[in-house]
Amino acid sequence: MHWRRGDIRAYLEVTAQLCQVHLRAQDAEAAWSDFEAYRNAGGEKLPASVWLDIARMLETQQNFDRARTEYQQLAEVHPNEKQAILALLGAGRLCLKRLNRPEDALRHYRAAAASPLPHLDWESNIQAGIREAEQALGKTPATVTPTKP
């Protein structure tokens, strides 16, 4: 109805809400359809919580590259929301564990570490991700084994 009246803003708002409803109902196909309709109508700033759930849904479906893209875009569009840190961690994890892109993983983890948002709850995960990405890049030894004289 909003679309037919040319009220794009209202259409985007309702479409984002529908997407959230479908995500909560675990209807991935309908949620994805809503997300695509939102994007195709020019929506660029989906609410961070909904966007994070879309990225997680894609990750669950093993659509890792698209999930990484959505995590990354979420972090760029909503840099001042806590979901941005979670998105950076998700993108870093995917780059490191699923996409074999440790340099990108390191960039995401470092961006999370540099975030001005409070993130003490995630600091250990961030630091572990940085260490693991550096190890994958050969920047630090994986383990230090004592040698016998």
Q: PLM features: what roles do these ranges have?
A:
Residues 2-10, 25, 40-48, 75-84, ...:
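Short solvent-exposed coil/turn linkers within tandem alpha-helical repeat scaffolds
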